[in-house]
């Protein structure tokens, strides 16, 4: 009961702003050492803090790397489709150290797209497009043109 009354009075004094409650905090809280609060020795707590800082740095580095990879992909797509460049993406790539490449899966997809585009631009790609046309019509036109040329040549040249 005495604790309850003492606690209520100290809270009222704190609210008034006289600052009489600072001594009570020390008595109630025990130590203000965070290591003791977590049940560790000082050395264990320092080692724990170092590990936490290292893990945070690794996570931040991985996050920055992922952001830079995404920015690299956006830059690649902007180049491919001739869109305006973004300063924000270039800044992200520079923050990561300029050694950023596309992720492996995306690189495979980009390579496949480039291969497909090269095939379409090549002669074989054009021939495959011709297969989609009506070959009978093309043959008839070619034969008609050939016979016309042959007839005009026979008329002009008496040797044939």
Swiss-Prot record:
Q: Which PANTHER family match?
A: COMPLEXIN (PTHR16705), COMPLEXIN-4 (PTHR16705:SF7)
Q: Which residues form the propeptide?
A: 158-160
Alphabetized GO MF terms:
SNARE binding; syntaxin binding
Query: In its UniProt entry, what is this protein called?
Result: Complexin-4
Which gene underlies this protein? Answer: Cplx4
The top of its lineage is: Eukaryota, Metazoa, Chordata, Craniata, Vertebrata
What is the membrane topology here? Lipid-anchor
Q: Taxonomically, which superkingdom?
A: Eukaryota
Q: Where is the signal peptide?
A: none
Q: In which tissues is it expressed?
A: Present specifically in the retina (at protein level). Expressed in the outer nuclear layer of the retina (at protein level). Strongly expressed at rod photoreceptor ribbon synapses (at protein level). Not expressed at conventional amacrine cell synapses, nor at cone photoreceptor ribbon synapses (at protein level). Weakly expressed at cone photoreceptor synaptic terminals (at protein level). Not expressed in the brain (at protein level).
**The protein's assembly and partners:** Weakly binds to the SNARE core complex containing SNAP25, VAMP2 and STX1A.
This chain's function reads: Complexin that regulates SNARE protein complex-mediated synaptic vesicle fusion. Required for the maintenance of synaptic ultrastructure in the adult retina. Positively regulates synaptic transmission through synaptic vesicle availability and exocytosis of neurotransmitters at photoreceptor ribbon synapses in the retina. Suppresses tonic photoreceptor activity and baseline 'noise' by suppression of Ca(2+) vesicle tonic release and the facilitation of evoked synchronous and asynchronous Ca(2+) vesicle release.
């Amino acid at each position: 009961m005495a604790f309850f009354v003492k606690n209520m009075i100290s809270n009222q004094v704190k609210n008034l702003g006289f600052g009489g409650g600072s001594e009570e905090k020390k008595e109630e809280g025990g130590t203000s050492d965070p290591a003791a609060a977590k049940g560790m020795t000082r050395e264990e707590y320092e080692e724990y803090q170092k590990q936490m800082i290292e893990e945070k740095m690794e996570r931040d580095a991985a996050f920055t790397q992922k952001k830079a990879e995404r920015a690299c992909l956006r830059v690649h797509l902007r180049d491919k489709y001739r869109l305006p460049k973004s300063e924000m993406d270039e800044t992200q790539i520079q923050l990561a150290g300029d050694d950023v490449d596309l992720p492996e899966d995306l690189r495979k997809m980009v390579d496949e797209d480039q291969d497909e585009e090269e095939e379409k631009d090549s002669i074989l790609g054009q021939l495959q497009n011709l297969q989609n046309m009506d070959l009978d019509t093309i043959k008839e036109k070619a034969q008609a043109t050939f016979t016309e040329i042959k007839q005009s040549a026979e008329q002009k040249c008496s040797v044939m």
